[in-house]
Amino acid sequence: MVVVENRARCYIMQYNIEINARLLKAVALAVTKTETRYYLNGVYVEFFGDYITLTATDGHKLIAGRQMRVFTNQSEPGASDGAAGQAGIILPFDMIEKIKLGKKSPDYATLSFDAKGDNLAARFLQLRFDATTQSGFEVEASYPAARRVAPVSITGETAAFDPEILITFSKAAKVVGSLATPVVHHNGLNPALVSWCPADSLPGCLAFGVAMPLRVQGDFQELPPVAWFTGQSAVRSTPEDKFKAETERLKAKA
């Protein structure tokens, strides 16, 4: 338990939760920057028995991560009890933004907060990382049902995506120290899954992304004329034609 004096009010910090700083910074790349959707201007932290989840979205992309519970900076043994059952917290982006990662930075930041009272007042938060402490209050709002966005069935049908969204996942991979190229699992005009965080990137952590496809507008649905450059027109291959061509290529290579 941590007691914090703040002006005329004394805050009793009942929970101290260790959050992987790199996972937190990576997930935060998906938050919105618009004031009108202030409830999305932060990372939603949820507490379960043996893990926590982190979620951020701006309505066009989503990044979600899971981290197994760790205890590296407890003031008292078992002081946090994992915070299972506590209401989720929207951790403000301006607190996360001030975390600066370096090669010698610690792995974890400590999120301290008090229990949610009956008065439903915003909880006072502290985010400690590498000898710095950020203080503030949780975002007072209900976070959207983000789990409904993540698809559980993928068609493989191709779609177009805003390049800026794809860049976000590349940045997230870099934050967690991965050199792997993010892969979009196309799902037609439905939300697509994105693999960007290899399982061995962060110990005890898993993460994925969701990208919303663009609705193609204009006259670019058809293949562009290329005969003037290549000497022949481009044609679409049917799945069967592509399969046969790939089979023959592999046979020739064997």
Predicted feature descriptions by range:
Residues 2-254:
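DNA polymerase processivity clamps
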